[in-house]
Amino acid sequence: MGSRGWLVSAVVGSMLGALTSIALAQDPATQSFSAPLELAPPPAPDSVDQDLIDAAARPAGILKYGPVSLIDPLWDNFNKTIDPLGLKVGLAYTAVYQAASGGPGRRDAAGGDIDLFGDWRLLGEKGGQNNGYLYFAAENRHDLGTGIAPSALGGQIGSLWGTTNGFGEQPLVLKEVYWQQHFGGDRLIVRAGKLDPENYYDSNHWQSDSKYFLNKAFSSFPVRAFPGQGLGANVTAKFGEQMYISTGVQDAQGKKTEAGFDTFFHDFNLFGAFELGFTPTIEGWGKGTYRFTAWYRDAGESDGKPHDGGLVMSIDQRIGPNFIPFFRAGAGEGNINGIEYMVSSGVGWQGQLITESDVWGVAAAWGRPEDHDLNDQYAAEAFYRLQVSPDNQFTIGYQVIVNPSFDPDSHVVGVFEMRWRISI
């Protein structure tokens, strides 16, 4: 059996197994759905679910009002008007500036990202256990007058991976649109449509360059070569109170800027992943999420990219109400991103500092290139995120990149960073 046959058989088999197990666990005569289960795994930091939660929170800042405070009542009234229709909508704008201390190319970059996102309950009642939702997310990305956007800065300074995970340049696109069907609350969730695989496999509490760390070693994990948003399906099933699986297949040549019907139905090159996760609550510490993921990606007939695959793990564990350390490790073939092994670890704080909801984090990473003639690369980052007003967050931070793999003449490169995010 070829790699594609193994991929399809393994993932589809696990999806069917999850569906069957959940179905057998539901006895219509005895099963009660009065208490919905907590989502497992927790929503990824950049998922539509989490973006809606963050937009609605509006925690107090050092200022009572901010640049968009006049819009808040109008946006609130709009969401109240559409709420009876089962519709929720959020809007965010994030701007980033980075300046490097060295490197062979350009040394500063600025970019912006505007996001419109939401979900629409089209099946079931509010608070129901078997509801169906249409999810959507649109995005525009652009530079801010520096000649390059932040996504290109890593290549300019010879880094093995990016100084950000996103913040490139693209027109307005519908990057995600999919159906999400719940069975028994959050015990079983089936998704189908244009999906972002980073939201369903090998996520992490701190995995967001719009909200937390910027360096790609922490805001993503580039030892894994996941494709962009593409057509496919995902099944997430919860077993008991502390175990889940997340598995699925989608277009290996997915791109957020393209619908993907040609590559999915004509080429049928697939990406598949299987994740086993645990969500224990440790007495005296708090809740954690422990993820173990295997993935494989077919070679692309249209984009010419080679096949790739690997194993990754991602752990984040609360220690008390504020500290959340994390650890990630992975190994892959390195055929696409050029990284064979990678480890990252760090800690963050969420809670009372200057304001009640400030965040800081510090982390370090190591990566080994697939080309062993290149240097192993190390990176570290520290940041502080201040809640300026209920809608506005300001982040300042610094990255250190040691032995950038593609610039052997540089031993250490620093990257200063600032970020402003507005979310309503």
What are these regions (language model features)?
Residues 13, 20-98, 105, 121-127:
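N-terminal periplasmic/intermembrane-space "pro-region" immediately following the signal or transit peptide
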Residues 28, 66, 71-89, 121-134, ...:
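Short loop/turn motifs that connect adjacent beta-strands in outer-membrane beta-barrel proteins
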Residues 80-82, 120-126, 180-183, 194, ...:
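Residue-level signature of outer-membrane beta-barrel architecture
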Residues 87-91, 130-137, 188-191, 233, ...:
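Transmembrane beta-strands of outer-membrane beta-barrel proteins
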Residues 95-99, 138-144, 194-199, 249-253, ...:
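Transmembrane beta-strands of outer-membrane beta-barrel pores
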Residues 147-178, 185-271, 275:
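Surface-exposed coil loops of outer-membrane beta-barrel proteins
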Residues 277-370, 382:
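Detector for outer-membrane/organellar transmembrane beta-barrel domains
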Residues 412-424:
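Outer-membrane beta-barrel "beta-signal"
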